């Protein structure tokens, strides 16, 4: 059974509901937040009527893995996501098990820190038309899915109406100031390279990913927040499927998007997914977890 929504009573207060996560404050830990990853799934900006069982758990456990890998290299907001370490006020809610992260509150920077290691998706479309990626000059003659000589930092910001808006990297300093902009750009690429190398040894190519950062206002240092290197925030390819000239299928919602498109349901609300699509999508997420962590899915 997929968990589509949460509703925690006092001492919790729900402060935000995203496409996947519910965020809570709690009077017992006022400097922290509770992130709960539900099993909701969206495509083409619409949330499906039914979810993907265990998806929220997979996202949480993959993020947990990457926070552990990256914490020597960057400050993070994660206090714990391990059930046995969470306070009783949380663990008395059994439905939250393995899908909850207790995190420190930080001021969030209004930047989506996207790093691209390979030319695919919207970057490939722009390159075909203009020969650039996010307005950046890149080598001529590149083929689809080819690796860039060096990973590109291609940020976006939230426009007033809530849609992501691509911006040139130079624009970031106008939004957060030059010091934080430099930290975000350099740290994003550094973290991507570390994760890319870890994943490649496990048979996965991270084509691109999105990081989000807060700032520790006592030190003015950036802090890695939100989910990290999951199938929802990244494009994962099987290394065994990879050839330059064609983008492989990814471990994300591409299977779902393909089904919606084939059935003329893309960009339509209130879509219920058939059981075979739900299960095939669930398997994709679980496979990503098992390959990345090297562990059998058991949650």
Swiss-Prot record:
Keyword Nucleotide-binding: yes
Entry annotated with the keyword Ligase: yes
GO cellular component: cytosol; nucleus
Pfam families: SAICAR_synt
Taxonomic superkingdom: Eukaryota
Gene3D superfamilies the UniProt entry points to: ATP-grasp fold, B domain, Phosphorylase Kinase, domain 1
Broadest EC class assigned to this enzyme: ligase
Stated family: Belongs to the SAICAR synthetase family.
NCBIfam families per record: PRK13961.1, purC
Annotated protein name in UniProt: Phosphoribosylaminoimidazole-succinocarboxamide synthase
Organism phylogeny: Eukaryota, Fungi, Dikarya, Ascomycota, Taphrinomycotina
Name of the coding gene: ade7
């Amino acid at each position: 059974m997929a968990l589509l929504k949460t509703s925690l009573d006092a001492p919790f207060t729900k402060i935000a509901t995203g496409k996947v996560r519910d965020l809570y404050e709690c009077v017992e830990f006022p400097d922290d937040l509770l992130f709960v990853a539900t099993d909701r799934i969206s495509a083409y900006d619409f949330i499906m009527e039914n979810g993907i069982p265990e998806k929220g758990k997979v996202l949480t456990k993959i993020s947990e893995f990457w926070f552990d890998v990256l914490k020597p290299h960057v400050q993070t907001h994660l206090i714990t996501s391990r059930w046995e370490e969470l306070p009783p006020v949380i663990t008395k809610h059994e439905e939250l098990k393995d899908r909850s992260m207790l995190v420190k509150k930080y001021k969030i920077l209004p930047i989506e820190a996207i790093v691209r290691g390979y030319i695919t998706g919207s970057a490939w479309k722009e390159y075909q038309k203009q020969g650039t990626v996010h307005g950046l000059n890149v080598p001529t003659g590149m083929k689809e899915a080819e690796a860039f000589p060096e990973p590109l930092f291609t940020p976006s910001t939230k426009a007033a109406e809530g849609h992501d808006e691509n911006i040139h990297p130079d624009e970031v300093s106008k939004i957060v100031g030059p010091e934080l902009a430099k930290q975000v750009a350099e740290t994003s690429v550094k973290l991507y390279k570390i994760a890319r190398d870890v994943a490649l040894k496990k048979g996965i190519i991270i084509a691109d990913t999105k990081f989000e950062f807060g700032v520790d206002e006592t030190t003015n240092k950036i802090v890695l927040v939100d989910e990290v290197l999951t199938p929802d925030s990244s494009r994962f390819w099987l290394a065994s499927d990879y050839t330059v000239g064609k983008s492989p299928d990814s471990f994300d919602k591409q299977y779902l998007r393909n089904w919606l498109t084939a059935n003329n349901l893309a960009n339509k609300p209130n879509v219920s997914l058939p059981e075979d699509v739900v299960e095939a999508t669930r398997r994709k997420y679980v496979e990503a977890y098992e390959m990345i962590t090297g562990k059998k899915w058991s949650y």
